[in-house]
């Protein structure tokens, strides 16, 4: 099931200013190899959110080739700390190259391994935590992330409508993870959540 009409997606992408060479190269690389990335429409939205809350400490749970990392790091600006995480050393190596070429290596910490384990090993609170790991892990990510977001900060999550599978039985483990995550964010007294039907569904949750 398509969450949005493909022609609408095309229309929105056509409206966007051209990305720089690095981001356009990453988009082509991801498309050729079927690597999921947030894409330019959500990338710009993520950039805007980072600027709106003046985020300086951001933890990404799952970063793949670093496409979202670059959008975040550019928005956060100098002096920020953005944590990149991925369990695939090859993806992390490629991401590092892209991040260096994008001019934001000074503010990105590259961590390789299980994202939730790495998160548990990283002290401190965060302005934004962005969840884009395996969907079975979303409920655990919720439980670990919410206590460590500062008041007024954001919990963000991609793929929360999961290609429409949230309304279609039978439901596999990934879909059940998304369903539970969505239930948790809307029942939490600590968050004010909104799910936007953009691309594959994007959750924006303000920490109260």
PLM segments and residue spans:
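A short alpha-helical cap/connector motif
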Residues: 1-128, 135-156, 160-208
